[in-house]
């Protein structure tokens, strides 16, 4: 039996803004929610703009502090600020590599920084791990001397994936990571991610608005609307028998209708 890798218990986030001298506005970006993720599983979080899905992703990655709730990985609690422990287990790929990669650093420096910060590896060991990771994502050893602007868009996203993989995490969170790529490059990256998952047992949390991409990459899905989960289940079940009006609308907008089990398998 595959045990739970990541467990989320009643996680929530409320933002408070000052709107005047004596007034504050409260926005409940993510209402209390819970879910689990198993090793080698892909969970898609889908919803419209402002649904809270990116805020949830940033809480999972440790980028923003939850208002309430618990996070556990391998039954070990995660706390806000435990960057070294968390970054060796949960990593993130961002939507736009052009803004998330330091343009003044060579690829070797970009990939070496997490290793220097979070491991005790010697320089030669770090160099070997950098080269190995680059090969894993389809980049050449010669690319170590390149700057990000010297790479094509697909190569930049491969570099973003390499940076996520460099510490050999158990979970990778991808926040609209492939949205800016054309269909050909997107398909290549999806196949690469699935290949790495099969070989290394990586679990993915994929945040997206693209229900077609969700269909091809995920096992389970959470549908979010205005900060709460309005539908959840296996990807096949949700696509074949959606219950919430938002889910039905998203499916109809992409496929034209809900997919039957036979049609889902055939199209997949």
Swiss-Prot record:
The keyword Isomerase does not apply. Keywords: ATP-binding, Cell inner membrane, Cell membrane, Membrane, Nucleotide-binding, Transport. Its main location: membrane. One of its GO terms (molecular function) is ATP binding. InterPro entries: AAA+_ATPase, ABC_transp_ATP-bind, ABC_transporter-like_ATP-bd, ABC_transporter-like_CS, P-loop_NTPase. GO terms for cellular component: ATP-binding cassette (ABC) transporter complex, substrate-binding subunit-containing; membrane. SMART domains: AAA. GO terms for biological process: peptide transport; putrescine transport. Disruption phenotype: Single mutation, decreased extracellular putrescine, in an sapBCDF operon deletion no change in resistance to antimicrobial peptide LL-37. ATP binds at residues 47-54. Residues 6-251 form the ABC transporter domain. It is found in: Cell inner membrane. It is a peripheral membrane protein. Belongs to the ABC transporter superfamily. Part of a putrescine export transport system, does not play a role in resistance to antimicrobial peptides. Does not stimulate K(+) uptake ability of TrkH on its own, but increases K(+) uptake by 20% in the presence of SapD; has no effect of TrkG. This is Putrescine export system ATP-binding protein SapF. The gene is sapF.
């Amino acid at each position: 039996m595959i045990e739970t890798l990541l467990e989320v218990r009643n996680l929530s986030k409320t933002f408070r803004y000052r709107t005047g001298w004596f007034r504050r506005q409260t926005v409940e970006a993510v209402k209390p929610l819970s879910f689990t993720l198993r090793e080698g599983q892909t969970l898609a979080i889908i919803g419209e703009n402002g649904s809270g899905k990116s805020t949830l992703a940033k809480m999972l990655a440790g980028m923003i502090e939850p208002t309430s709730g618990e996070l556990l990985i391998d039954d070990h609690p995660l706390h806000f600020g435990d960057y070294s422990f968390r970054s060796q287990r949960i990593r993130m790929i961002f939507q736009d590599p052009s803004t998330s990669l330091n343009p003044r650093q060579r690829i070797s420096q970009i990939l070496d920084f997490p290793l220097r910060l979070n491991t005790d590896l010697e320089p030669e060991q770090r160099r070997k791990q950098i080269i190995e990771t680059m090969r894993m994502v389809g980049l050449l050893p010669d690319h170590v001397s390149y700057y990000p602007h010297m790479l094509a868009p697909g190569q930049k996203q491969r570099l973003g994936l390499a940076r996520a993989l460099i510490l050999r995490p158990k979970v990778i969170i991808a926040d609209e990571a492939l949205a800016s790529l054309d269909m050909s490059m997107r398909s290549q990256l999806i196949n690469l991610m699935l290949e790495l998952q099969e070989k290394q047992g990586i679990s993915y949390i994929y945040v997206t608005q693209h229900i077609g991409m969700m269909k091809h990459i995920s096992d389970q899905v959470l549908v979010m609307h205005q900060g709460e989960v309005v539908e959840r289940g296996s990807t096949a079940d949700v696509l074949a028998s959606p219950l919430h009006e938002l889910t039905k609308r998203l499916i109809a907008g992409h496929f034209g209708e809900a997919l039957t089990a036979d049609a889902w398998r055939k199209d997949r």
